């Protein structure tokens, strides 16, 4: 299972680190994902959920 938020679709994005001399190296920015048990179709299931979705109340934990 990929590390993508089940509800919001947030996932890893890539970009560059830029030094003072404007050199660039690849970097990744990862979302704060938590493994949470939620009810899906009336059955408990463990899914990756972003902390933002948990805090905003979009997710109901079991």
UniProtKB/Swiss-Prot annotation:
GO molecular function term, any single one: structural constituent of ribosome
Q: Which domain of life is it from?
A: Bacteria
Q: State the GO CC annotations.
A: ribonucleoprotein complex; ribosome
What is the protein's name according to its record?
Large ribosomal subunit protein bL28
Keyword Repeat annotated: no
Q: Does the keyword Ribonucleoprotein apply?
A: yes
Report the HAMAP family cross-referenced here. Ribosomal_bL28
Q: Which gene codes for it?
A: rpmB
Keywords assigned by UniProt, alphabetized: Ribonucleoprotein, Ribosomal protein
Q: Which family does it belong to?
A: Belongs to the bacterial ribosomal protein bL28 family.
Q: What organism does this protein naturally occur in? A: Streptococcus agalactiae serotype V (strain ATCC BAA-611 / 2603 V/R)
Q: Name one GO biological process term.
A: translation
NCBIfam families reported for this sequence:
L28 (TIGR00009)
């Amino acid at each position: 299972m990929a590390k993508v938020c089940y509800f919001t679709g947030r996932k890893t994005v890539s970009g560059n680190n830029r030094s003072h001399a404007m050199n660039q190296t690849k970097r990744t920015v990862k979302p704060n994902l938590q493994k949470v048990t939620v009810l899906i179709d009336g059955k408990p299931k463990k899914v990756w959920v972003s902390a933002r979705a948990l805090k905003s109340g979009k997710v109901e934990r079991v």
